[in-house]
Regions:
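Acidic helix-start/capping segments at beta-turn-to-alpha-helix junctions
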Residues: 1-6, 84
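His/Asp/Glu-rich, glycine-adjacent segments
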Residues: 11-169
């Protein structure tokens, strides 16, 4: 969050309202995700580790807000691999923030009074094609160099076993 908000607002994280990806709320003692928006839902219908999200905690305007301010009729959408990238770019007035969710395609947040169907309408056809393509042609990672294969290894952190590959398989 602080990186995305800094690049997309031109402001220091101390002034964007997003000083870190997560922090502890001094009033409640609870951990808070930078884009937490408990009143919202996620359009794809499944909760994520981050929970419901939105631009509520972003306290400044972004590139998308500036574009909409200068040209209100313009269509401004933000697409990213992460919610942080999409929401911070889309700001408060952009037309849509979309990010990739495995097994679904592009998703977004839904504010009270909105429907998931309406919020997903701009990307519905893309999502259908994407899911069909991934089912019929699952991505296969190959090693470009044997040096990468040599980096694949097993490792343990706090009694949990992991296996890493380069690129991820």
């Amino acid at each position: 969050c602080p990186g995305h908000s800094t690049v997309l607002t031109g402001m220091h994280p101390a002034t964007t309202g997003l000083p870190a990806n997560d922090w502890v709320d001094a009033k409640t003692g609870q951990e808070v995700y930078c884009l937490a928006a408990p009143q919202n839902t996620l359009a794809h219908g499944r909760n994520t580790d981050n929970g419901p999200v939105g631009p509520d905690q972003l306290e400044v305007t972004t590139l998308a807000d500036w574009l909409k301010d200068q040209s209100p009729q313009s269509r401004v959408f933000a697409v990213s691999g992460k919610d942080r990238g999409a929401i911070n770019l889309n700001g408060h007035t952009g037309d849509g923030a979309y990010w990739f969710t495995g097994g679904f395609g592009l998703t977004t947040y839904v504010e009270p009074g909105q429907t998931a169907q309406d919020r997903l309408a701009p990307v519905a056809a893309f999502n259908t094609r994407l899911v069909e393509t991934l089912k019929s042609q699952p991505p296969a990672w190959t090693y470009a160099f044997e040096d990468c294969r040599a980096l694949a290894s097993d490792w343990t952190i706090r009694d949990a076993a992991f296996h890493s590959t380069v690129p991820p398989a």
